[in-house]
Amino acid sequence: MDGKEKKSGSKRGSKVFQFDDDADDDEPIGSLLEIMKHKSSKKDKVETESTGKQRQKQVVEKKLSALGKDSEDMDDTLASFRKRLKGNKKGVESGTSRVRNHEGVDTVTNSNLKPIEEANKNEVQSVLLRENGASNSIQKCASETGTLLHKFSGKDKAASPSHEKVETVSSEKEADVFHQITKEESEIPMSEKAVELSRVSVPMPDVHGEVNCTIAPDKHIHLGEPTSESGYYREKNLVMCDCGTQFNFEDRSFESNTQVTLCQKCKYSSHHNASNGGGIQVNTLEDGTAQASPVSIIPCEDENFRGDAISLPNSGKPSTLQRPERIAKKRKLGNMVYEGDVKWENEQGFLDCQSDKSFKGSDKCGFVPSISKEIEIGRAAAVTAGLKAQSVSPIEKIILKEVLKRKGSNQEYLVCRNSILGLWSKNVSRILPVTECGVTGGPSESELPSASLIREVYKFLDQRGYINAGISSVNGKAASSTNQDYDLLQGRQLEESSMASVADSEEGVAFILGQVKAVESTSEGKKCALQNDERDLVGCATSEMLESISKKCEASIIDDNKRSVSMNALQDSTASNVEKHPETFSVAKPALSSTLSSAHSNQMRGRDCVPCEVIDEKKVIVIGAGPAGLTAARHLQRQGFSVTVLEARSRVGGRVFTDRSSLSVPVDLGASIITGIEADVPSERMPDPSVLVCNQLGLELSVLHGFCPLYDTVTGKKVPAELDDALQAEFNSLIDDVDLLVEEIGKERANKMSLEDGLEYGLQRLRMPHDKVNIDKFGLLNSSSKTGIRGPFMQDESWKDDFLNPLERRVMNWHFAHTEYGCAAVLKEVSLPHWNQDEFYGGFGGPHAMIKGGYSRVVESLAEGLDIHLNKIVSDVSYVSDVSAMDNSKHKVRVSTSNGCEYLGDAVLVTVPLGCLKAETIKFSPPLPDWKYASIKQLGFGVLNKVVLEFPTVFWDDSVDYFGATAEETDLRGECFMFWNVKKTVGAPVLIALVVGKAAFEYTNKSKSEHVNHAMMVLRKLFGGDLVPDPVASVVTDWGTDPYSYGAYSYVAIGASGEDYDVLGRPVQNCLFFAGEATCKEHPDTVGGAMMTGVREAVRIIDILRSGNDYTAEIETLEKAQRKSVPVRDEVRDLIKRLEVVELSNVLARQSLLRNMFFSAKTTVGRLHLAKELLNLPGETLKSFAGTKEGLAVLNSWILDSMGKNGTQLLRHCVHILVRVTSDLFALRLSGIGKTVKEKVCAHTSRDIRAIASQLVNVWLDLYRKEKANSGKKSLRQANTTNTSRIRRKLNSPDTDSKGKLSNGNDVKTDEEFEDNQLPMSEEEKAVFAEAEAARAAAEAAAKAFSEAYHNTSLQLPKIPSFHKFARREQYAKMDESDFRKKFPGNVLGRQDCMSEIDSRNCKVRDWYDFPASCLDLDSARIPVDNYSQPSHSNELVSHSKFRECSGESVAADTSFLTGAWVDTGGSSDGFKDSQAIDRWQSQAAAADPEFFNRTLHIKDEEDSIACSTGPPSWKHDQRANECSVSQVTVNKEPHKNHIRSADRLKQGVVDFVASLLMAPYRAKKIDRDVYKSIMKKTATKVMQHTTDVEKAMAVTQFLDSKRKNKIRDFVDKQVDKYMVIPQVPKP
């Protein structure tokens, strides 16, 4: 252009064809096309000549689309076609074109065009983008016009039509394009000149149609249909296409050559030539629906042709040629995988193709992601969303049955689904649009086959609440790249008012292109008309958002007299609040306090009953603003429904309530615990849904630890650990044997028994002779009630004392009370067979946690943007019961409140607590069906209360999260039985006492002060009256008498079952729906369960109101059938019967039967029964099948499945089995059970589980030592293959011969002991053994000399090790197995949390503590301990030579480190030390200590080296020093010590203990060296500052008792939390 345009050629990948000059002009076009269709190898060229005048010759690719014209036109010759193309030259130059808008088609001439400068800013204009210039206006693609833009010739001037017309300009010349994507970003200066719009060729096989580009107003443009109810807005200087892709030319720079910005979704392209003044050419191609289009016949070598409607200029008038469509079978491209192909999921990269990439003519993305990482992210995201990671759930089978029934579609679907879920999990705070998944918002004929699958999966995930859930919004905390190129709603204060979400299409995709600005009221039938002169806002908002804005609302007020009046609601500038309309959702999101206070304020002003109607908008009324109601309302509103929430309280949240006024800090008086914060992918357990909102808000969680010390109120001391562990194991066994008891006594009888009866019966069977245990005493005289416990057994407890002493009874009662806390009911009222029916679902994954700042922050965030009416006590709900009447009725439900207001809607969702339904506070008309009332009556609703105490200081053990207290009386066992230490959560000394069971039901019999006094009495008994100050503030709850809850949460009462949860949640007449925790059988009594039911019912309402199908009911039926297919108790009965059959047969038959059942057991109860039988088998028999790789894999699956609720007993038995069958470390590694034990079992909350795990680790370590000893000998046999040249060289050495004679016999003898079946050794092998033995003998002699010389040296004072050495300590701690030789009693662990009870009996516990952290990875292909001595030879010797400096209690180092590290065979990559390594070690040892070879070393055997004492000989029999440090080096105490040395010794003990705590985060690189040193210094200094002279004289273990260790651990944890950098959750 301007005579300076460079030649442009077709780049690789483009498919632009050119007619040859010598083509036969008389040849029919159809035959010509047929010939060109098969000339795929021919390369066409486009040449551009620069002369005095602009000349361009370009052939543009375009598929022909038939619109109804006969096929005769294809017989036109090329000559006639060229003649018609030329037409009237004057008409072309004058820019005559044909224009079509949504109202009609008009012809526009030059006289009708106006310059851009004169155009009205508020009109939709069309601009001609000319060369050497750019437009400063916004460009918009509107496919509805169906027109094309073409380039004017250089003589034409910029002009624009009126806003009612869209101009189409054609040109004789067309320009080619380069298929190159711009990658750099910068600003393009926009001039006043118009930028020329030109149609460009996009060489894509699925290119289709055209998109009209117009200019929008200066501020905003409207996308979508002209009559759309929702408008979308974008900042100026944006070019947008129909698929939702935006191009911001203001922020993008173009390279010096011609480039194209290509929309991968709809093939929208923008062409720019920087060499000509930055002109931008924009074009998109769509399906052939346009009635005005130029002829462009460009065949794709692998595609078929379609005819397009063409518009030809003829004497200044547009003409249209409609050509028939030629339909032929598509040929598959060789480089593409189509829908249904097996490799579809492997080549699908649609979710990773979000950035600009070079286009090479293929639809596949050029980005190859990290497959394994993306797959893991997708699977974790699927589990987090509540789906299965690698299989299809029942809901997917029902909804997507058409998609899944194709061959190979399951795997394709899973890949697609997990990819979309993983994409959203990377930023859960924003709404993921479908366009970011690589497809357009709507289907098209020429899109990839996978696009329909992606769109269908996205629609399913979005509508079912698996993505874009919680409080996600368009403007998330970290917006995606597609949302960073522009600002939404320029000029608006988004931080003050963000717009609500509205579904923009039936695809269920909201906010793909932008935020909703207004809901256009184009229909005259709408009764609510809102007038706003300045802004088009919808709904009624608070005065903060409607200042100086007047509005008029005409609506029908429904009152007691059923009068209809017209009301003008004018905004008063002095008014503080304005009531929101109940039947329109609020568009704005003001502060929650303002939103809620507005409803209360206007209720007092009598303006609270103004329902507004919008035609064709479904209205849903939600009763209750708890977690379930808010979650449902939010999902319904985002899907385009009008939602009104009615709440009886003056606040939102329901039973979630954070008190911010009674104490100095906010405290949760209702729900307070998130019952699972992490997705457990192996067991497919999702986290609590409230965690999603916490992540979206960035809330900080306080993770709870499982250790709960138990105090006895009678003695005022801790319950002995041995007794506590024994009784806890006994109680867990009783709980797990409940299912067996049910099978034993029969279901009919068991259904009439309570859980307490079953536990007492099981306890008697364990403690009493069988002839004295009578089941008839249980369950017959019982009578449950709603208020407390009834029956003779709670009145007379003397019969229980026959087999339990008083202390045991108090401890057992505490465990009973803890179970009552889980059920919120007395055990006498809980069903025996169904009390834990939710165990089948496993609960939520991850540890429990509390929210800093309170749980109300979650529900308050859910309430933002919703139309909530507070203080609305619902009294009556009327619904249409007749189906025929329902079809004729405009409104199906009517909700009335106590103040006379009524609300009409299409559906009502009842989320009130079960206690309110039991109390019948809401009257239903007609009454609820009998089956609904039966479930309401049968299910139980329990009570849990709290006594919150705030103290001036902390007097309890602040390192624990909770502690228990026994009760003297059985009836009062649940009163203040547990105290929650919430100091680290709330930041103040606060304890929360729990009141459950009978004490909670009799709660009202005492006053608030009496409850506080009782809690204080218990605390003073536990900690001493003088140490417990009076509380500075207190709060007492009483949920049982709350008129809006009547309790805490639900439980399965006697006579009920888990199916009652489903029955309670079923809808009535498809217009009355129920949600809440009492309708969630999977997760009852949890906030997460309530939120899940809210989404469930919202989805059900959407399905019924839109399609009339209740897919949720189908899912429940399918799941019920699946549960019956694997009946729990039927499997137990089958196991028992089969074992009874072979009881009298031979032993081998029984063992074979157990083996078969071991590999086929499916249920937890069946596995538990089988595990008990397996433990009775002989060890070798059990090891023969359970110790193999397959058997260990089965045990691994059992352990993973037992990590859910109430699986402790099965887990305990599995670990016992592992202790007995472990004999092959290789099989252990291959099965994956080592990792499971390390990550799951070692971190288990149960103390007895950790104690058993310690025994298992001992077994593994012993087995490892034996295997290593054997491998050392066997590895020497292989040395000749790698060191042949070196061996031959040394064979000729006389030293080698002599060394061989010294030890060859011993070596052979040792080899024969371990390898009886080995072949005779060759001469070279013997030489290797001789060399190694010689080196060993020399090293032992040197070590012995060093040891004897060291004994004679004067003792030195211990030195406080430098922190640099402590940071390096892990090197010599890893050198060999000497650290692992230190055994510890297996029954010591379990007193406290792994490291809490380190005393003289378990001083070797460091081995156990380090093992799960990083010392032994049993899943690796090699045991990494073999490699621990490899990293640095020099560092190893320095560490060993100065090892005594690193021991806080020693004056003489344990010489086993010296002999074990290099003398023993092991530690190299091949499992042995060669002579070079030994020589190197000797030279380094001599360099470190010149007297090394002049000393004698006292060598002890392996077991003695575990605790060897290297002090002076005269002290040989002195008592061994107490050890509690990381070094674990044993020393003899000196007879004379001063306070300085004692202080150093204590300080060293503290340093060692702190090092043990910091080693794990340091090795995990969560803290660096500086933080390590800083925490070490601070901790040691603080501890020693508070140490008295009397304490300095104590032994280390006496000084570091459990209480002091807990304080140190808590201090270290706080320091680590302070310094550790917490990574952002991708969410995960």
Curated annotation (Swiss-Prot):
Superkingdom assignment: Eukaryota
Keywords: Chromatin regulator, FAD, Flavoprotein, Oxidoreductase, Repressor, Transcription, Transcription regulation
Known cofactor(s): FAD
SWIRM domain residues: 378-478
Compositionally biased tracts (Basic and acidic residues): 43-64
InterPro entries, per the entry: Amino_oxidase, FAD/NAD-bd_sf, Flavin_monoamine_oxidase, Homeodomain-like_sf, SWIRM, TFIIS/LEDGF_dom_sf, WH-like_DNA-bd_sf
UniProt-listed SUPFAM superfamilies: Conserved domain common to transcription factors TFIIS, elongin A, CRSP70, FAD-linked reductases, C-terminal domain, FAD/NAD(P)-binding domain, Homeodomain-like
Residues covered by region (Disordered): 1-71, 1271-1317
Family recorded in the similarity comment: Belongs to the flavin monoamine oxidase family.
Function text: Probable histone demethylase that reduces the levels of histone H3 'Lys-4' methylation in chromatin.
Protein name, per record: Lysine-specific histone demethylase 1 homolog 3
